[in-house]
Amino acid sequence: MKRRTVLQQIALFTGGLIIPLSSNSWVSKGLSKNPSQKKLIVVFLRGAIDGLNVVIPYQEDEYYNNRPNIAILPPNEPNGVLDLDGYFGLNPALKDLMPLWKKKQLTFIHGCGLENENRSHFEVQHYMENGTPGNLKNDEGWMNRLLGILSSKNPTQAVNIGSVTPEILRGSIPVANLPREKDNLQKLSTDIPIVNKLFNELYNGNDSLSLAYQEGQKARKIFIKEFENEMVESSKNAPSTSNFVQEVKKMAKLMSGEANTQLGFIDLGQWDTHINQSAQLNRLLMPLGEGLATLALELGNLFNDTTILVMSEFGRTVKENGNKGTDHGSGNLMWILGGNIKGGKFYGQWNTLEKKALFEGRDIPITTDFRQPISNILSTNFDLSPQLINQVFPNFNSKNSLNFISV
């Protein structure tokens, strides 16, 4: 068996930490000279969440005319929206986010999306994750390119919650995957002292494969130390912690602890609500809101240096369909949370829900390229120059700043 095959089997063993191996990784190509203490967490809602039932324009008659069965009632009505600014209201299932809105640590950007309109889940997720719309062949994620700029000798600098590296983090720079299930962080053969000793002796050199093995072992030790209590509970048949609230607690621990994680990614599915949307959305939004509020709380003072970005591939139709659901749309909300956010108000362009103002007479139009808010975050929080931002998002001309971050 080849050395590379052996290492890949170790690295990709489903029971432990996963570190993708690459001959182009930072262990062989050098480090950036742009260190930063700021942190970024991306939460991707796969399936296209209905942003119009997240932040509701309850003052518009067209909202209720188009959604007789699935509209959220105005404030002061049973299960009505939570008023935000006298015009928009928050879905009551997200009540846990209201304190962040009142503290001006939460904002929403209207009409975000992929400017070359596309309603294919696969293609739009691909473009949003690789950051190069129109290029289906590119399989390198924009967060991996960002990691290449920020990279330090830290094997847990970028962490994905999940066992498979998502496209947004794929690339030449190694990232760490933390399995969603606690019992997936079980012992590996390399945890057996005699086996560990043999592998340590075999891969103690300075070649790229040896360095990759060494960094993988270092990262695994950090993870085991950070989640020692959880691993003990798991051995006593503790329930799975794959739910979002528990996952964000792990992420906060990694960012504030020895792992010193700087970039984090979590994805959540089942947002494609074509049928009986109200019940589905309520079931999904409650743990999402609770989890985001928990993440802010668990980060503590570190929340001031952290930006949490919640995004989805596209929005949904303004008009409900015949199955009390909605279909694939265009513009959507981008959610941004953080201690240095100029929150408590909205950004982006909102027109109306009149048919003449909608894209193709049916969708919220895309008025803000999804890369624009991210570029603002990279510029302000990570102090990236336009040239470096262009490395993250090639061929994207960043327009006027949305100015939603305090310097």
Please tell me what each predicted stretch does:
Residues 120-121, 322-328:
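Short glycine-biased active-site loop of nucleotidyltransferases that positions the nucleotide triphosphate
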